[in-house]
């Protein structure tokens, strides 16, 4: 396709600038097309160039860094009104400066105006246009501009080709970019390092790191030595996809090719190793950096500290903090936030508070993440008043609570049986512009279900759906469990049938809830049918599923059916647990078969389990009314 476009470039020259270019510009850009409005604009001053007596050439030399749109238009206006007219070289300087500020539409609009003034493009201005077209995702126009280059008799250079190649890569059209490289070589242009780096980056963005490596190796064969920039995208993709072993191999290959490695490349691999659980390897690589004289920075330390903390090795994370302070590398808010969060998760709230004080002492302002972690710690310790004080503090410091902050507080209220306070906070949340998410609704629905306030729970669920907050599998588990536990199994089955017909992937947990609900509602036969259908649905029953079904069969009777399933679960590779044995022991005791219960107790003990509180209570009750002999109690010890 690209080859065909290259061959047709010359025929497309007349259409290379479309009138619609100006449609994407600002009002100021649109005024350039209107002479009367332009005359009015001539009267106004401009911010960056206050000296009206400065010539446009002096301004071109002195003030084009980070040029603003209004200033660029003012300068362009002065240039087109100068006599004699400036050369195309002068205009190219202005266009280049504007392009560096990423105001690509403005460049294209001004190029059009220059052309209308009779100033012909040169290779440089057309190359700038190609870059702007590519950045604006207007590749057809970029190729048309290339056609104009060829028609005017200019020889496209490597930079021009590289710009087009980059444009194709930006749109994910890497195969076409590779074709253009072939065409470029046919025209006698050797791809340079910029071209290769562009292609490697494009291949990596498309998830084709293997092809990127082949391209690099081919490049070495042609005598073009890759640099650290070339390998960066490949290392990044490898580490993100968990291919840390390959990333390490590539690191060694880079060393063999005498490519200077820096902290950035090492940090990429260290980050990948941390995220995929290879903390010791990450720490070894960190030490290797030190031995090779590669200076570690705050980013490297933060990655490692985060890795250790996420793995629960907060002590190692704290050691690294002390080490970096000793090396005069100042920790930042990320460093402290990671450690504070880790201490909170480990239940070490006091240490987290000490770290908070330390960061304040060092003049480091906590952010929303820091405050939210501390609020989480207070909620876990049931210090809700302190949690609210922390919210007030963060707001006073200009940190807005986010949805996670509110979710933590609402969960804290629910755990403390202050669900009405949680609901009130939920209502106030929207006044702060914070939109509730699935976690928010799940927390409140669960809280009201546990209190038996099903009407409120159902209203919240309906509100959730109407506000287009997507319920997830956890939402349905909470709701179905609440309905079943509160005697509304029919409603639970109705909802279950709907989600079974949906595309949501259901796990064994949700089937356990429904089977248990059916058994409690004396629909054991229906529960059995659903249990037997699980393999056909591609769902494997677990030990808990068997226990629920055995319990249901025990309630329905006869016990022989429960015994058969008990033996079958072992045949199916599911070893019974203490709950399985206790269910059967109580069932046989209730049926008056103490002998069978004794055998099951002996088997239970051999398997390393013990009699639970429910079984002990049943035995004591039966002893007290004479249904069991006192000697039976000795069996339980």
Swiss-Prot record:
Localization: Mitochondrion
GO molecular function: RNA binding
Transmembrane spans: none
A cellular-component GO term for this protein: mitochondrion
Any one Gene Ontology BP term: mitochondrial mRNA processing
Swiss-Prot/TrEMBL PPR repeat ranges: 87-121, 122-156, 157-191, 192-226, 227-261, 262-296, 297-331, 332-366, 367-401, 402-436, 437-471, 472-506, 507-541, 542-576, 577-611
InterPro entries, alphabetized: Mito_RNA-Proc/Resp, Pentatricopeptide_rpt, TPR-like_helical_dom_sf
SUPFAM superfamilies: HCP-like (SSF81901)
Transit peptide: 1-95
Claim: Transit peptide is one of the keywords in the record: yes
Listed Gene3D superfamilies: Tetratricopeptide repeat domain
Keyword entries, A-Z: Mitochondrion, Repeat, Transit peptide
Chief location bin: mitochondrion
UniProt record similarity statement: Belongs to the PPR family. P subfamily.
Name of the protein described by the UniProt record: Pentatricopeptide repeat-containing protein At1g12300, mitochondrial
